Amino acid sequence: VPLDDDTIRLAKGPNLATVVTLMPDGQPQALPTWVDTDGEHLLVNTEPQRQRARNVARDPRITVLIQSGDNAWDWAEVRGRVVDTVGGDEARRHIDELSQRYVGADYQREIGPEGRIILVVAPDRELTPAKLGG
């Protein structure tokens, strides 16, 4: 499923996303985060030891809801799967790019020895207000 133009626009802007993964007991875990896209996938930068990373390593299903910071009714929901993780220097550069977009400066938090990873999300289904007729 190719990403909708509205989804790409929202993912390229400084809009927060809610990332939903499944805990080991099946309960959903929903957390706000920064989001990005390469035009084909959504990209979520995290630390490999975080619960969301452990969740998708076990069960790659993921839902990402992006809402415009200017208009909460401008949103896109992507249900999909994590199809790859990217680490190393690329993930480090990516978190700095995201931080520049969201706060105007390089990432300030200390990055531990585990480093950072990018969760690469392939969309299976998308929902936007336009697809609902709104």
Task: Cite the ranges covered by each PLM segment.
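Charge-dense, helix-prone N-terminal extensions
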Residues: 8, 38, 133-134
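Short beta-strand segments
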Residues: 14-48, 54-56, 63-66, 75-78
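Amphipathic alpha-helical interface surfaces
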Residues: 7, 49-55, 78, 90-95
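AMP-binding (ANL) adenylation modules
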Residues: 69-71
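Alpha-helix boundary recognition
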Residues: 9-12, 57-58, 112
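Charged, gly/pro-rich active-site loop segments
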Residues: 1-2, 74-134
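Extreme N-terminal tail/first-helix region
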Residues: 1-16
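Residues at secondary-structure transition points
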Residues: 2-5, 29, 47-51, 89, ...
